[in-house]
């Protein structure tokens, strides 16, 4: 009989968001008249920018003409998109990133998991707690951990608590770690990192020959000019960091699928024989073997983000969600709840009232006011007693949800 990858059996019963969906669906079936407002999973609600739609429509027409039809594209992405990303997203901010170091993909979630393909099994891996569950679960699947304890922490991972006491920014570990996951603006807490904070991480990584996985999926929500958008704005980062970005949350591509990963050609790691190997070459080989590239139509849509009209439309879209976050933050604060994030980030991190556990608060919100959020404990043990509220919804729904919550849970 064929055998399985037993590492999957170590995973907790359900990935966080499917478990939320299961509970919501069960409630909806039992209460078909309930008007449920979903502020849980970070999926966008507003239409694609007009510039992106127009570019994609034009690309579809091109695919209908033999002279302009496109078949397989380059696995790394089309040069015209990579050049615009390098110029406008990185070089314009003083970050030294070349177009050849950018790999276009169908999602940063995929890339943060797939990147493990090019790393060995004996690395010491550090994650923040709470953390985006994909970072942990993909390492479990890859066999990089032992079993989970009663708190859900996996043996073999180094957990770096982020709490109100440290402003939800992890402290540099006292021990040596090899791979470090950082996400700023942070999912789920909405925390941001200063240049000084990221410089400390880069210095640590250089001193210990570590690699930082920097998830910048929400960088477009940064409005404070003093905050870095890319880790490559930090001196020395090209020697220690891989950055992941996405078009999902700035241009609404959650259903369209386009993202990018930056692997500097100066970034190296050790082979078993002790030699230094360029990670760019390994990632390029991995993508060329396992990935056929993002569709031409979608990449033309992503390219339109960098047009004058596209930039204005994306800015308006991000501002819309930031205004939602401001409403959530202000209303919940006025109700007496302890609230974090929601500034320079689309997520608001809320302390649950009256000592409720994260899942108990989830159930109460769902059952009493028909509002869905995300239990903090689903992001890790240190998230227990917290709750994530997403700004990704219509203005009408956000205002109605806040009205319901504040009337029910005002302290």
From Swiss-Prot:
One of its GO terms (biological process) is lysine biosynthetic process via diaminopimelate, diaminopimelate-aminotransferase pathway. Pyridoxal 5'-phosphate binds at residues 72, 108-109, 132, 187, 218, 246-248, 257, 292. GO terms for molecular function: L,L-diaminopimelate aminotransferase activity; pyridoxal phosphate binding. It catalyses: (2S,6S)-2,6-diaminopimelate + 2-oxoglutarate = (S)-2,3,4,5-tetrahydrodipicolinate + L-glutamate + H2O + H(+). PANTHER family: AMINOTRANSFERASE. Involved in the synthesis of meso-diaminopimelate (m-DAP or DL-DAP), required for both lysine and peptidoglycan biosynthesis. Catalyzes the direct conversion of tetrahydrodipicolinate to LL-diaminopimelate. This is LL-diaminopimelate aminotransferase 1. It comes from Nostoc sp. (strain PCC 7120 / SAG 25.82 / UTEX 2576). The gene is dapL1.
């Amino acid at each position: 009989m064929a055998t399985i990858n037993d590492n999957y059996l170590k995973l907790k019963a359900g990935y966080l968001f499917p478990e939320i969906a299961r509970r919501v669906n069960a409630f909806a079936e039992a209460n078909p008249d309930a008007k449920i407002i979903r502020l849980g999973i970070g999926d966008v609600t507003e239409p694609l920018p007009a510039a992106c739609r127009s570019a994609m429509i034009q690309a579809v027409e091109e695919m209908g003409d033999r002279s302009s039809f496109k078949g397989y594209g380059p696995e790394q992405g089309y040069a015209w998109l990579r050049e615009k990303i390098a110029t406008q997203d990185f070089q314009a901010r003083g970050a030294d990133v070349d177009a050849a170091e950018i790999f276009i993909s169908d999602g940063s979630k995929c890339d943060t998991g797939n990147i493990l393909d090019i790393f060995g099994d004996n690395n010491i891996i550090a994650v923040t707690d709470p953390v985006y569950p994909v970072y942990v679960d993909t390492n479990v699947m890859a066999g990089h951990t032992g079993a989970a304890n009663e708190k859900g922490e996996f043996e073999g991972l180094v957990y770096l608590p982020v709490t109100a006491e440290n402003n939800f920014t992890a402290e540099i570990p006292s021990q040596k770690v090899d791979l470090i996951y950082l996400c700023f603006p942070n999912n789920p807490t909405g925390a941001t990192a200063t240049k000084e904070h990221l410089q400390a991480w880069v210095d640590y990584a250089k001193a210990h020959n570590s690699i930082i996985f920097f998830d910048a999926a929400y960088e477009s929500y940064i409005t404070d000019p003093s905050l870095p958008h890319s880790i490559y704005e930090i001196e020395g980062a090209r020697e220690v960091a891989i950055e992941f970005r996405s078009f999902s949350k700035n241009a609404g591509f959650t259903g369209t699928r386009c993202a990018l990963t930056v692997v500097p050609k100066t970034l190296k790691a050790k082979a078993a024989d002790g030699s230094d190997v360029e990670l760019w070459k390994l990632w390029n080989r991995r993508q060329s073997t396992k990935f056929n590239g993002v569709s031409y139509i979608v990449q033309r849509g992503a390219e339109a983000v960098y047009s004058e009209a596209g930039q204005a439309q994306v800015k308006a879209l991000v501002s819309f969600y930031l205004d939602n976050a401001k409403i959530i933050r202000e209303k919940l604060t006025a109700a007496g709840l302890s609230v974090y994030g929601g500034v320079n980030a689309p997520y608001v991190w809320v302390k649950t009232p009256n000592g409720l556990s994260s899942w108990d608060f989830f159930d109460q919100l769902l059952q009493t006011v028909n509002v869905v959020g995300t239990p903090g404990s689903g992001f890790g043990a240190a998230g227990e007693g917290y709750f994530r509220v997403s700004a990704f919804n219509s203005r009408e729904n956000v205002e109605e949800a806040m009205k319901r919550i504040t009337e029910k849970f005002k302290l």
